[in-house]
């Protein structure tokens, strides 16, 4: 069975906006499309990504890109208990805490982000890697 990964907004934006880390994020997205990885995001990742895509490309193109991504990436949600756990955690960034604890709740294997601060806060049950570091593991 393919590894389950949570993909943070910055990774999707690197790919969709062709930012500096585009080539690495493209490799990761290709593995997802090829079915070698199962990818997950939350509704807030859709929101964040949609916001920046709309600013860059307009609403119609943003929706088109998001719908294409959601062909291969599943949306998972946070519940009340997960939100409480996230808010009681040592993480000071509330958004990151909600994403991380949602992924933990859904038994995701790896959390992929370019956020260096979040990478330092991982617990053994859900390791956090940059896209490149994760690809190096494969």
Where are the predicted features?
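Active-site neighborhoods of divalent-metal-dependent phosphate/nucleic-acid chemistry enzymes
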Residues: 74-116
